[in-house]
Amino acid sequence: MMMIVLVFLFGCAGVPVRPALKEEIGVPPGKIDGNQFTGIRYPFEVSVPPHWKMTTEFPDFMVELGYERPDPTDKEQTELYAYNPETKSNINFDMTPAGRHDRFSQKMIESLTASVTGNIKSDLEKERGKGVANIEIGPTEPISLKGVQYAAKKHVTYTLKGQKREQGWIYGFMEPYQIFILYTILEKEGVNDRQDMKKILDSFEVITKK
């Protein structure tokens, strides 16, 4: 997806802080039961409002919103897509193992989250054309997610073809996983996707094995 390609996989020399893990794309992402998702590939749960839909397959409409259709052979695979069929507002969840040497702190998470906005204006115009207007970049903020040690959020708002949009990204870490959450809100009169999005994020939880 245009400028919001969260590639925060990095490494540094030194003593390993965790065993080497790999992305198990052969394992099913998880189980959808009504409006509840329970992860199998990675240990997280999330629920959506009744009028939203969830799928582990890439929704076709997201190509028009700037997302690239993933290749089945990609080493990184998004575990869950959730969206409002009426407005096409959506939120997508991905987890991936952290590298053996990667170390995390809240300060570092916030710094990496903020760094994504470096070329955001030019990237938006390249992806959407010159019709993009009123681009505003929001602050980098810590965010509390259940079962997550460190997390930060940032967003950008803009207008395209008379419609206001918000695109945001959340980057988090809970040993031994990195967490990537991308969302898009397409505003429509009479629909409160922003409130729905908050409920979805409030329901998200990384389950710690006991």
Residue spans of the language-model regions?
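Short hydrophobic-acidic sequence motifs that mark active-site Asp/Glu residues
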Residues: N90-N92, A151-K153, Q178-F180
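Short N-terminal helix-initiation segments at or just after the protein's N-terminus
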Residues: P16-D33, M95-G99, T113-K126, S144-Y150
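Sec-dependent bacterial lipoprotein signal peptides
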Residues: M1-C12
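A short acidic-to-branched-hydrophobic micro-motif
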Residues: T73-S115, L182
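N-terminal targeting sequences that direct proteins away from the cytosol to non-cytosolic compartments
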Residues: F10-T87, N134-E136, I143-L145, L160-R165, ...
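Residue-level recognition of well-ordered beta-strand positions that form the cores
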Residues: D94, H155-T157, T184
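Signature of long, low-cysteine stretches enriched in small and polar/charged residues
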Residues: Q106, E110-F173
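Short amphipathic beta-strand/extended segments with alternating polar/hydrophobic composition
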Residues: V46-P49, N92-M95, W169-I170
